[in-house]
Amino acid sequence: MSDDFELDTDDLKRRMDGAMANLKTEFASLRTGRASGSMLEPIQVEAYGQMTPINQIGTVNVPEPRMVTINVWDKSMVGKVEKAIRESGLGINPQLNGTIIMLPIPELNEERRRELTKVAGQYAEHARVAIRNVRRDGMDQIKKAKADGISEDDQKFWEAEVQELTDKMIKVVDAALETKQAEIMQV
């Protein structure tokens, strides 16, 4: 039988890091009352027959703490960009000035801040679930190797490795959530 089982923990870590990267992208899309170019990243605009991110249609700048500007390169795209922002659900009212779209970021009220912290919590839970799914995949590989004949000591060693990696990544998610919630609640 096989006693030389080697679990690819680098692959598990890479997949868990992918869940974390996805969480950071989702967190960036949450409006905190502070202007940020990354808040526009999830918004796609119908441009030249395909959906395109705003940063590929114009230059996104943050000239003031509560203002984002987009200098649209193609004048014919200004209306489409404005429409995409209005329909994005960010609660931002674009103002046009030629090919420049100005996005004043209003202050968040207490109720909206609480809603956003709940949404951030949901995003974090999705990341935790994704990390646990990777853990389950790793544990399944270990069980399969156990059936193929690895020793019980090796099985316990690899299970502990996978669990340690999982616990570490869950702590990273929790810390990111705590930071994001504090940022959202800051007035």
Swiss-Prot record:
CC terms in the record's Gene Ontology section: cytosol
Listed SUPFAM superfamilies: Ribosome recycling factor, RRF
An annotated GO BP: cytoplasmic translational termination
Short name of one Pfam family: RRF
Localization annotation: Cytoplasm
Principal cellular location given in the protein's record: cytoplasm
Function: Responsible for the release of ribosomes from messenger RNA at the termination of protein biosynthesis. May increase the efficiency of translation by recycling ribosomes from one round of translation to another.
Name recorded for this polypeptide: Ribosome-recycling factor
Organism name: Ruegeria pomeroyi (strain ATCC 700808 / DSM 15171 / DSS-3)
Annotated gene: frr
